[in-house]
Each structure stands twice: as structure tokens, then as C-alpha cells.
């Protein structure tokens, strides 16, 4: 004979599990389909763009400030985005993205410090981009995952929030404000 326990015993555990799992759910890019202006990454990153950003550790403390001077060039569905980072401590870095625009708003990209291929998709005014980055820290290099979300505010301004994690543990967050140079 099968014996069922009273819901009073297992319902609180089930409810807590559902709440915890819901907290792990991420945004869905499709929810931005009706948002305007429409983001065409190849158009936005064609030419000069400057960004100002911060990195916050998992407690929320700002531990790094930086600017990024970018120059993008597109030839058909192939693009190059040349990024020059300047940090508040004077350190400088450079990353060159080689990007490909695919059908349905999908993009892929590679860079020397990116492991494998980054992939993302633009829908409405939003773009979601995921990749693994080789991050140098105190003489060691760590592979960390980035979940990047960009939101086009108007033709010139775009905001970016990126969550950085390792082994699924959130390490911090990057926030950027992009401003497209218009002649």
C-alpha cells in the first residue's frame, strides 16, 4: 500500500524550492521585442563610441572605474570593434572584437582574451551577450563568465549591465554607459 504524507509536511519545502529556483531564473530577451528604439548593434558600433564604467564586487562596493574608447567598423555582416580601456589607476588594456552579424538579430564574436566564441542576440532595444573571458588578477589568469545585457536608450546612449561569475558564483557586476559620437 502506498502511503502519502500530509501536504503540511512537504508543501513548505516545495514552496521554498520553487521560490529559490525562480530567483535563479534570468531575463528573457524576447520580453524586449516591442521596445524602441530598435537596436542594430552593427549600426550602433559603427564609428566612435566612448563608455564610462565601474566594476562592483559582490558586496556592491565599487572597486574599479574606467573609460573605454571604441572604434567600430563594419563591412557587410563582419565587424571589428577596437576597445581601448583606461582604468582609474592608470592601467591600460586593449581588446579587439571580431564580430559576425547573423540572421534574426544573432551575433557571434571572438577576441584574444575570450575563450571560444561569444554569442548573443538583439531583440527590440536590448542585446544579451554571453562569453568566457581570461581575466588576469595578480599574476594569475582566471576564466570567468560574463552575462552582458545592453539597452539602447536613444540613438546615442546605451546602458550595459554585465554579471561576472565563476562556477556559477556571482563575483561582481560591470555597469557601463555608452555614448555614440555623432559628427
Residue ranges and their predicted role:
Residues 147-183:
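Glycine-rich, aromatic-bearing surface loops/beta-hairpins
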Residues 32-48:
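N-terminal helix-cap/turn-to-beta initiation motif at the start of protein domains
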Residues 30, 68, 74, 148, ...:
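Sequence-level preference for short, compositionally simple segments enriched
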Residues 25-28:
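Bacterial signal peptide processing site
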Residues 62-68, 141-146, 170-174:
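Amphipathic hydrophobic-ligand
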Residues 52, 56-137:
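Central antiparallel beta-sheet cores of small beta-barrel/beta-sandwich binding domains
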Residues 2-14:
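Bacterial N-terminal signal peptides that target proteins for export
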Residues 21-23:
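C-terminal motif of bacterial Sec signal peptides marking the signal peptidase cleavage site
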